[in-house]
Design a protein with these regions (language model features):
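Conserved class I S-adenosyl-L-methionine
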Residues: 9-16
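Conserved SAM-binding loop of SAM-dependent methyltransferases across substrates and taxa
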Residues: 20-31
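Conserved SAM-binding loop
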Residues: 47-48
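Conserved SAM-binding strand-loop segment of SAM-dependent methyltransferases
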Residues: 55-65
């Protein structure tokens, strides 16, 4: 990310900076002053200490990026936003014509956050109607997760689906029809550290489901049912996920066109390989 784009001709503003790691890297590489905007006072304090220790020209600015007065900090600066989530990157584009920023370097992330019930396009010609669930699809993948994490996530999903299968069998009507589908709240991680029977028992107690006496062999059956359902869900997901990258590309191009319509010269591309982060799309904009 730091290597993409030309050397900045203006001071930098790091948007949603955390501890300001990116800002310090850019200040060191480009020899420019950096202001790092972050809402969390603890992160601001930690960033200021790191900048002082490294003797780098970096100012930590504790402010809310979504507040109206935050736009005043953009004037005359080039804005860098690495994985600013949802409305945090969209607000930069919406205010671009009046913010007075010299340029933008934006790698968007978590497109669904702050979108409300429906996505509001950033460019005039965009007409695709997207709801929150569709936006979430753009970031639903585990490219960077280690193999053992993927196995654990698959097992957790199978256990949850196994419980649903057991619950549906217990609560089915006399006509044999399954009950209406319903979800349940996230489960504590500790419930997933034991065995399948213990997991189902704890979840049933919380959900008010009265389970019959279940033998060890029957637990194995319901666990296998969960795995079967997981594989079925996986097949359906493969169809949906075929559109994932295209959807994300559309969202990034909407961002790029939004900046172009606000009188910026714009480029869009990638800044790293997807194995480092699947959110590797970048928009560069200069006056």
């Amino acid at each position: 990310f730091a290597a993409r784009g030309t050397r900045p001709a203006a001071p930098l503003l790091e948007w949603c900076a955390g501890k300001g790691h990116l800002g310090r890297r850019l200040a060191q590489a480009d020899g420019v002053a950096v202001t790092s905007l972050e809402i969390d006072p603890a992160l601001c304090a930690a960033g200021a200490a790191l900048a002082a220790r490294a003797d780098i020209r970096q100012t930590m600015l504790c402010a809310d990026a979504l507040a109206g007065d935050a736009q005043a900090h953009l004037r005359g600066r080039e804005v860098v936003a690495l994985h600013a989530c949802g409305e945090l990157h969209r607000t930069l584009v919406r205010s671009a014509s009046r913010s007075g920023a010299a340029g933008y370097r934006i790698a968007p992330c978590c497109y669904h956050l702050g979108a409300g019930d429906a996505y509001r396009p950033l460019s005039a010609g965009a007409t695709l109607a997207l709801n929150t669930d569709t936006l979430r699809l753009a970031v639903t993948e585990t490219v960077t997760a280690p193999q053992h994490v993927r196995r654990r996530l698959a097992r957790d999903q199978a256990w949850k689906l196994g419980f649903v299968a057991l619950r549906d069998a217990v609560e089915g009507g006399n006509d044999g029809a399954p009950p209406a589908p319903r979800s349940f709240r996230p489960v504590p991680a500790a419930w997933l550290t034991g065995d399948f029977a213990g997991f189902c028992g704890a979840l049933a107690q919380r959900e008010g489901v009265v389970l019959p006496e279940v033998t060890q062999g029957q637990w194995a059956y319901w666990q296998a049912q969960g795995e079967r359902r997981r594989l079925e869900v996986r097949r359906h997901e493969l169809v949906r996920h075929a559109f994932r990258r295209a959807l994300e590309a559309w969202l990034v191009l909407d961002l790029a066109l939004g900046l172009e319509e606000r009188s910026f010269d714009v480029e869009a591309g990638t800044f790293c390989e997807r194995r480092l982060t699947p959110r590797n799309l970048l928009v560069l904009a200069r006056r």
